[in-house]
Amino acid sequence: MVGFTEIGLAAAMGALATIAGAFEDAESDVGSQSNPNSQVQLAPQMMNFHRYFNKAISGEPVSYMLYGAIAGTVTWVMMTKFGLPFLAAAAVGVGVNALIHMVFATTAHLGRMASAAEFGHPIYLDVVLSHLGPIAGFGGIATFAIVSLAYIQWALLKHPFPLPLLAALWGVTVGAIGSSTGDVHYGAERLYQHYPFGGGVPVAAHGNITRKAETGIRNSMDSVYFCAKFGNPLTGLCFGLVVFFSTWAGLFGQWGAVIAMGLVTLGCLIVSNRVEKKARESYGTYEDVEMDEICDPV
């Protein structure tokens, strides 16, 4: 019989996964990482200079596998070799990883921006300094949640894999979900806001990203402010539901998990349909426009 302890662990893992997914996507938005990054990288070649932070050397799954492995390894060493409790050990592991994270972010951004010097693009040092804090902060929260997930599996559920390996695997998973779920709202929704609603991103517009903010010139902090309203929570919800319902298979059997996931999927489809219909009724259908009718993003 399933007890309250097992249900509590499943709920805790789902909550931690939700936090990890939301803040992982927020961190990638601050740093212009993963799919939309190609548009930020292409912009200087199209003579569209910008103030976005641009740090993607690898995709989110690979980078968060590294961050999870680093934080998980340091946490495991602090617990097994120095006898620290989990929270203290995790704080040390996340702190060490945050320092490495900022080093990688800095070198990646400076390297990419330096490569754009051929097109006359400058390096804005204030952009580097102002974005490193949120990158380390959001990444630290996501990494702490990842390590906590791994700890629950390793220490409480007695998973045969060691904690560092579990943290690395969770890092790959949350990075993949953040890349596939959250990037839409940073890419087509935010980088191309000066184009008509619902038109997508035509090939001819690649690199012609939005550079004006509500006030002044846009940077990546504006992007995460926008994505925190919908894209980040949606990513967290996606990862949280995946983890939560995957634990249901062990708690309530295969069919219990299938039925629960089916009901949630049906509910999401209904909500998505209602939201899209309301958006179309509010903003109208997409109409073709001439390029000279589109506002200048400079």
Swiss-Prot record:
> Which enzyme class, named as a word?
translocase
Which Pfam families does the entry link to?
MtrE
EC annotation from Swiss-Prot or TrEMBL: 7.2.1.4
Q: How does it sit in the membrane?
A: Multi-pass membrane protein
GO BP annotations of the record are: methanogenesis, from carbon dioxide; methylation; one-carbon metabolic process
UniProt keyword Calcium, yes or no: no
InterPro entries referenced in this protein's UniProt entry, alphabetically: MeTrfase_E
Principal localization? membrane
Q: In which pathway does it act?
A: One-carbon metabolism; methanogenesis from CO(2); methyl-coenzyme M from 5,10-methylene-5,6,7,8-tetrahydromethanopterin: step 2/2
Does the keyword Iron-sulfur feature in the UniProt annotation?
no
Q: Which locations, inside or outside the cell, does it occupy?
A: Cell membrane
Q: A cellular component term (GO) from this record?
A: cytoplasm
Report the catalytic activity.
5-methyl-5,6,7,8-tetrahydromethanopterin + coenzyme M + 2 Na(+)(in) = 5,6,7,8-tetrahydromethanopterin + methyl-coenzyme M + 2 Na(+)(out)
Q: Which UniProt keywords apply?
A: Cell membrane, Membrane, Methanogenesis, Methyltransferase, One-carbon metabolism, Transferase, Translocase, Transmembrane, Transmembrane helix
Q: Where are the transmembrane segments?
A: 3-23, 59-79, 84-104, 132-152, 160-180, 230-250, 251-271
GO MF assignments: tetrahydromethanopterin S-methyltransferase activity
Q: How does it assemble?
A: The complex is composed of 8 subunits; MtrA, MtrB, MtrC, MtrD, MtrE, MtrF, MtrG and MtrH.
Family, similarity comment: Belongs to the MtrE family.
What's its job? Answer: Part of a complex that catalyzes the formation of methyl-coenzyme M and tetrahydromethanopterin from coenzyme M and methyl-tetrahydromethanopterin. This is an energy-conserving, sodium-ion translocating step.
Q: What is this protein called?
A: Tetrahydromethanopterin S-methyltransferase subunit E
Q: Which organism is it from?
A: Methanopyrus kandleri (strain AV19 / DSM 6324 / JCM 9639 / NBRC 100938)
